[in-house]
Each structure stands twice: as structure tokens, then as C-alpha cells.
């Protein structure tokens, strides 16, 4: 999960990384009030998860609260590379003597952590890496040993930071490592890390990417989720602990096991070529749980997508037998009632398949159509979706 700058700075403050005071807001009037509270010139900064804010007019210096009001009015609603600005950060402006760059990231290619540091900060680091690669130091970090003050100083030194700021920069670099490890991040980046005229080291900007696989031990990270940018159906699925990804097709997919669901997507897409080009509408893996509650939640999410014209349930019974899946489908349709209005093609195979098929046959719901094979089920679901368009 990528964070907004203001969220990254909240984590910086938690780990005592020095930065400038400020607050986030959604209105220009509040931006003026925050500037008045700060009592000094401020920066008005668009909060979007994309680079190039400054060039797009999303970062402005405001000498007075009235300037803050004007800039906030201009920035809110601005389109920056397809991202509409809904929030702005009002932060105290800082005098800058020099700008540096520092980041920690997961180096997947070499299966280690990596620190990157440069005396040339404040510009796109990709440009520096391409045009002047010697200016960007890359220092591997041992996952067990981590970053102590000595290594932090070495990172700063290899980044060619001035000798007079090495010690103070090392302290901040070590604290940024604490953010990286303590918050289960895959990226912590500060660009620029600045030196003020009185030799303070401040993180003026911040970019943090959190590892969603660590959410179970980071409950506080839930508050960082950008619900405005997340598809409402995906949010609804997440509330029920369903592994769901919305796609752009017309055939809803439910399966058990990521591999089977991925195969189902392919088979439905292939079948759709013969039926007006219909495509899968989603990825939904119910895992090993096919209870009535889980199935009802899954169907409720899929049927909430107005693009869905049919649903294909493709389940291979293993530990969760097909009779349990069939009972789950029956219970789900009873729970949903009239909400379930799209045809449901069901293909069961594996453990207790005959019992499962018998349960669905006895239920005899007008929307349920059974299929013997995955290919037949995909073709039927695609045909039904095409006929409804």
C-alpha cells in the first residue's frame, strides 16, 4: 500500500524522524487557518500518489495565509497525471541550504535490503541514476544486522554528503531504517532530505510503501487505506475477508484456490471469444471455506457489479467437499432472495461431487444451471452473459 506524503510523515514522527510541522486538509479555508496557526510562510502540497507534483503546479510557496488560500483553491481539484487532488498538506516552509536523497527498499533481485543515498536530491532520482550513476550510492543492508549508526554514517559518506553533516545525517538515516523495519515497509524514501542553513537535517518529503502481507501484525495501518481510491466492491469483499479483484468483464467468477480461479479466468476469456467477446468480471477466491455465509458474501459482492450478466461457480472439492459447497450455494441463494437475479452456472468436481450435484438438483432453483466440465460451464456462462447484453 502506497501512502500519501502526510501519512508517511506521520510514521516519520512516530519514529522521531525530523520533519516540518503541518496538517492535511480538504478545504482552502482550512488551509488558510492552518497557515495562520503556523505563523510563518508555508508550502501548499497536493496529496497524490504520483510523482511530478511540482511540475504540474501541485506544490506552491505561500508567504501569507491569503496566499495559502489562493494556492489551495487552485490546487484542490487539480488533475495530476490522472489523479484528482482531494487533499493538501499545509506545512511550514523551510530554508534550504542543500538537498539530498535517501531511501531504503527491498532488493528482490539480490534478495536483500538496499540503501540508496545521493548528495543530488530534490530531483527525480531516476534521472540521476541514468545521467550521473556515480552520484547515487547503493549499499546492501544485511537483514539480520540492520542499520546501526556506523553503517548509517557509511551510507551518508558513500552518498557524498558533506563531512560536516555526516553525523547528523546518520542519526536521521538510522531512524528512517527504523521506519522501514518497524512498519514493515518495502520502500521508505525521502527526496529531498535537506540541510538547513543552521545544519539541521529535515525530511521535507516522504514516500512509504507498506507490505500488505504484514497487515496481521500492523493493525494501525488500516487507517491509512485510501477508501476513496479503492473500488467499493473490493472494500466490501475485504470486509468479509474475501480475496477479490474487480476486472472489466461480464462473467462473475467464484472458485476455491487461486490456481483454479486463474485457470477459470483463462477458460472464460477463451469461451467469450465465441460469444461477443465477453470477459471475466472478477477474481474471487473463497479458499477452503464454502459455507453459506462465505458463498452469500461472495455472490453479494459479484452481483453488486452492474457489469455482471452471469456467474460461474467453479469448485473442485477437496477438504471442503462438494456437498458442503452445494449447501453453501443453496443457503446463499436463500439469504440473498430477490437480490440474486443473474444466472448461476455451477461446475462441481472432486470429493462428494455426486452428493453436491444431487443437492443442487433437488433445490431446483431457476437461476442455477449445472455443468459437467469447466469448459462446458465457461461456455454456458459466457453465452448467458452475451445474451443479456
Curated annotation (Swiss-Prot):
The residue range of the signal peptide is none
| Record organism | Mycobacteroides abscessus (strain ATCC 19977 / DSM 44196 / CCUG 20993 / CIP 104536 / JCM 13569 / NCTC 13031 / TMC 1543 / L948) (Mycobacterium abscessus)
A molecular function GO annotation: succinate-CoA ligase (ADP-forming) activity
What is the documented function of this protein?
Succinyl-CoA synthetase functions in the citric acid cycle (TCA), coupling the hydrolysis of succinyl-CoA to the synthesis of either ATP or GTP and thus represents the only step of substrate-level phosphorylation in the TCA. The beta subunit provides nucleotide specificity of the enzyme and binds the substrate succinate, while the binding sites for coenzyme A and phosphate are found in the alpha subunit.
Q: Which PROSITE patterns match?
A: ATP_GRASP (PS50975), SUCCINYL_COA_LIG_3 (PS01217)
Task: Give the residues the record marks as binding ATP.
Answer: 45, 52-54, 94, 99
Chain ranges of the ATP-grasp domain: 9-236
* UniProt keyword annotation of ATP-binding present: yes
Q: In which pathway does it act?
A: Carbohydrate metabolism; tricarboxylic acid cycle; succinate from succinyl-CoA (ligase route): step 1/1
- Tagged with keyword Glycosyltransferase: no
Query: What does it catalyze?
Result: succinate + ATP + CoA = succinyl-CoA + ADP + phosphate; GTP + succinate + CoA = succinyl-CoA + GDP + phosphate
Q: Which InterPro entries match?
A: ATP-grasp (IPR011761), ATP-grasp_succ-CoA_synth-type (IPR013650), ATP_grasp_subdomain_1 (IPR013815), Succ-CoA_synthase_bsu_CS (IPR017866), SUCC_ACL_C (IPR005811), Succ_CoA_ligase-like_bsu (IPR005809), Succinyl-CoA_synth-like (IPR016102)
Q: Any idea which UniProt keywords this protein has?
A: ATP-binding, Ligase, Magnesium, Metal-binding, Nucleotide-binding, Tricarboxylic acid cycle
> According to the UniProt entry, what is the EC number of this protein?
6.2.1.5
Q: How is the cofactor bound?
A: Binds 1 Mg(2+) ion per subunit.
Q: What is this protein called?
A: Succinate--CoA ligase [ADP-forming] subunit beta
Cofactor(s) it depends on: Mg(2+)
Amino acid at each position: 500500500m502506497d501512502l500519501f506524503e502526510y501519512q508517511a510523515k506521520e510514521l516519520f514522527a512516530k519514529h522521531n524522524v525530523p520533519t516540518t510541522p503541518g496538517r492535511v486538509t480538504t478545504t482552502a479555508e482550512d488551509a488558510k487557518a492552518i497557515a495562520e496557526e503556523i505563523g510563518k510562510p508555508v508550502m501548499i502540497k497536493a496529496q497524490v500518489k504520483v510523482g511530478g507534483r511540482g511540475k504540474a503546479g501541485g506544490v506552491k510557496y505561500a508567504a501569507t495565509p491569503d496566499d495559502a488560500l489562493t494556492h489551495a483553491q487552485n490546487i484542490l481539484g487539480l488533475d495530476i497525471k490522472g489523479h484528482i487532488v482531494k487533499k493538501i498538506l499545509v506545512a511550514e516552509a523551510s530554508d534550504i541550504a542543500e538537498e539530498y536523497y535517501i531511501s531504503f527498499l527491498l532488493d528482490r533481485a539480490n534478495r536483500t535490503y538496499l540503501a540508496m543515498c545521493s548528495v543530488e536530491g530534490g530531483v527525480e532520482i531516476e534521472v540521476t541514476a541514468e545521467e550521473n550513476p556515480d552520484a547515487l550510492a547503493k549499499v546492501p543492508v544485511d537483514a539480520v544486522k540492520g542499520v546501526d549508526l556506523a553503517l548509517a554514517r557509511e551510507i551518508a559518506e558513500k552518498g557524498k554528503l558533506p563531512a560536516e553533516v555526516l553525523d547528523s545525517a546518520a542519526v536521521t538515516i538510522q531512524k528512517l531504517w527504523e521506519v522501514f523495519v518497524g512498519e514493515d515497509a518495502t520502500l521508505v524514501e525521502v527526496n529531498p532530505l535537506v540541510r538547513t542553513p543552521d545544519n539541521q537535517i529535515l525530511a521535507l518529503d516522504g514516500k512509504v510503501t507498506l507490505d500488505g502481507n504484514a497487515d496481521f501484525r500492523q493493525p494501525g495501518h488500516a487507517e491509512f487505506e485510501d477508501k476513496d481510491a479503492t473500488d467499493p466492491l473490493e472494500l466490501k469483499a475485504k470486509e468479509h475477508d474475501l480475496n477479490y479483484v474487480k476486472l472489466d468483464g461480464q462473467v462473475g467468477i467464484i472458485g476455491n484456490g487461486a490456481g483454479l480461479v486463474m485457470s477459470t479466468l483463462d477458460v472464460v476469456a477463451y469461451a467469450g471469444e465465441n460469444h461477443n467477446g465477453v470477459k471475466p468480471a472478477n477474481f474471487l477466491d473463497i479458499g477452503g471455506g464454502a459455507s453459506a455465509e462465505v458463498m452469500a458474501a461472495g455472490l453479494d459482492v459479484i452481483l453488486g457489479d452492474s457489469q455482471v450478466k452471469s456467474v460461474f461457480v467453479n469448485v473442485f472439492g477437496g477438504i471442503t467437499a462438494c456437498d458442503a459447497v452445494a449447501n453453501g450455494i443453496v443457503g446463499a441463494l436463500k439469504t440473498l432472495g430477490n437480490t440474486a437475479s443473474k444466472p448461476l452456472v455451477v461446475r462441481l468436481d472432486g470429493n462428494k461431487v455426486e452428493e453436491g450435484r444431487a443437492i443442487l438438483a433437488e433445490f431446483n432453483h431457476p437461476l442455477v444451471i449445472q455443468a459437467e466440465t469447466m469448459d462446458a460451464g465457461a461456455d454456458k456462462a459466457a453465452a448467458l452473459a452475451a445474451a443479456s447484453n
